[in-house]
Amino acid sequence: EVGGQANALVHHNPNATIASRGCPMNCSFCIVPKMEGRHFTLLPDFTPRPILCDNNLSALSADYQNFIIDKYKKSDVQLLDINSGFEPHSFTEETYKRWKGINKGAWRFAFDEMKEERAVKRTVEILREEPASKKRVYVLIGNEPFEQCYERVIKVIEWGCEPHVQPMIPLNAMTKRPVVQFDWTLQKLKDLARWANRWIWRSIKFDDYKKVRVV
C-alpha cells in the first residue's frame, strides 16, 4: 500500500479485523506469544468488520472489551465470527453477558490439554443456554497420547458442544504435516480429525468409522 503499512489480515480476508495482538497464556504449541508477545498490544484504531480475530478476548481488560463492543455498536457492523475465540481460564459469566448481545456467531474456545478440563467445563456451564451448534470447541490432538486426546473430543460432545479437531503442527514446520509422536500414526491423526470435523460422530462411533473409512 503506497504511503502506509500493509494490513496483511485484510489482504488475507477483507471481512476480518483485529483489535489486539499478543496473548499472556504462552502455550508451547502456539505461535502467537513467539510472534506477538505475551503482553497485549491494543489496537484501538481497528476498523469493525464481521470477523474479529483477537487471540484472547476474555483476557483483555473489561474496559477494553467494552470499548470493542461499543465500537461495533456505533458502526452498525454485525459481528458474525469471533474467530480465535475466548480463553476458558478467563471466561466468566460477566464475559458471556458482555458479548452475548453482539456475538451473532458461535462461541469458540479450546480444550487443548487434559489439565484444562475444569476450566473448559466451567465455560460450557456458563454457555448452557446456547445450542450445541453455537458452542465450537477447538481440540488439539497429537500433543498428548491418543486416549487423552480422544477423551477430550468425547467430553466436548458429551457436554453438548461441537468439536473442531486440529492435529498439532510444529511451530517451525515448512509444510502442514502434523507431529507424529506417542502412540499416534499419521493415519490415526487424519481419521480422528475427519470423524470429528465432518460430524461423522453423530452417526457412527470412532472405532467403527476406522473399519469403514475410505482413505
Model-derived segments and spans:
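A basic- and aromatic-enriched beta-loop-alpha substructure that forms the phosphate/nucleotide-
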Residues: 1-5, 9, 185-186, 206-214
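Core AdoMet radical
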Residues: 31-123, 133-142, 162-167
